[in-house]
Amino acid sequence: MSIIFQLVLTALVFFSFVMVVAVPVAYASPQNWDQSKPLLYVGSAIWIGLVLLVAILNFLVV
């Protein structure tokens, strides 16, 4: 269970770095906003899901 927690936490950290770069780029390009909007929503949902999964696994591991 500890290895699963570490893998999910690592995925959250890497995905957070990707979102830190991707979100400002998507907001800075107004001509591609219609194409970027669904990706931002999906990325935000994945990030929230990873945060909740880390919280649940943290409760189970510790």
From Swiss-Prot:
Q: Where in the cell is it found?
A: Cellular thylakoid membrane
Annotated membrane-spanning segments are: 8-28, 41-61
Any Gene Ontology CC annotation: plasma membrane-derived thylakoid membrane
Its domain of life reads Bacteria
**SUPFAM superfamilies membership:** PsbZ-like
**What membrane topology does this protein have?**
Multi-pass membrane protein
- Kindly give the InterPro entries that the UniProt entry links to this protein: PSII_PsbZ, PSII_PsbZ_sf
Q: Which GO terms describe its biological process?
A: photosynthesis; photosystem II stabilization
Asked whether the keyword Oxidoreductase is assigned, the reply is no
* Xref: NCBIfam families: PS_II_psbZ
> Which family, according to UniProt?
Belongs to the PsbZ family.
What's this protein's name?
Photosystem II reaction center protein Z
What organism does this protein naturally occur in? Crocosphaera subtropica (strain ATCC 51142 / BH68)
